[in-house]
Amino acid sequence: MKLAVYSTKQYDKKYLQQVNESFGFELEFFDFLLTEKTAKTANGCEAVCIFVNDDGSRPVLEELKKHGVKYIALRCAGFNNVDLDAAKELGLKVVRVPAYDPEAVAEHAIGMMMTLNRRIHRAYQRTRDANFSLEGLTGFTMYGKPAGVIGTGKIGVAMLHILKGFGMRLLAFDPYPSAAALELGVEYVDLPTLFSESDVISLHCPLTPENYHLLNEAAFDQMKNGVMIVNTSRGALIDSQAAIEALKNQKIGSLGMDVYENERDLFFEDKSNDVIQDDVFRRLSACHNVLFTGHQAFLTAEALTSISQTTLQNLSNLEKGETCPNELV
């Protein structure tokens, strides 16, 4: 099978090539996004491999179909960028990687949490300038504090495991409670309760039409003053404009974002010599209590190996006509 891989970075290429030694696919790597204009580059390929910011809308899928593509392989868990109804109508099979390394994402979320709480990012900049003042660096002891986790799939449960180690009170919301989470002593509550009682809120749910801008002005109004929010899931779970207002009135005490709702034109590229045109992003990133990372929570050697293994195994199953547990349509 010939496979076109889009949005490729060197780390993608390295691990896919390593894993492919046991599959023998013909891999063609492209560093640009899959769009309606670039879909023609998949000509002659039975499958395409895409990432979070690639375009899987109906026009793109129709173009891929014209060029002989049969399979769409997402090398990520989220699939909100793919029109599944259109894929089904066109007879395209879509597969994903539902859980590559839950601990990797959870550990990154914890890293953001600790950095924001203890102002490590600010202390780092100060000490580089020989400023060893501790003013403005006071954090809070996490032990005993209530932490709310929204979404208790594998990543959410991994997050709860770590938070339990901190001795925090564990609150969670998920329409489908997890037995693994309950074994940790998690208290499932509704969203208003989670919002009003949590000192720290961490997002670990997929993006769906129903939870678009889950954290909006109304949600922020229900939260404690000075709440910490960390999002390593999907950017559009947070209304960025509403977050700016909540930061201004100090409803949000600190905000960690590994994802951003308009990240498609920013993340995964070096923009250090560009003038960022996204005014909302610029306002957020200018806040000392906002920490951005560029969608890197997944980026560990173990996760990249797992992603590559699952992606190629998914395609192998489809090619052989075998059942694929990660098939979406």
Please identify what each model-predicted range represents.
Residues 135-225:
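Rossmann-like dinucleotide/phosphate-binding beta-alpha-beta segment
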Residues 90-92, 98-146, 158-161, 165:
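Phosphate-binding beta-alpha-beta segment of Rossmann-like dinucleotide-binding domains, i.e.
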Residues 1-95, 216:
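An N-terminal-biased, well-structured beta-alpha scaffold segment characteristic
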Residues 230:
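Glycine-rich nucleotide-phosphate-binding loops and adjacent flexible coil segments
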Residues 52-53, 199, 205-207, 233-234, ...:
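Short glycine-/small-residue-rich Rossmann-like dinucleotide-binding loops
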Residues 226, 235-329:
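Rossmann-like dinucleotide-binding domain for NAD(H)/NADP(H)
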Residues 66-71, 90-92, 168, 225-227, ...:
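A short helix->loop->beta-strand "cap" motif at the edges of active sites that frequently abuts
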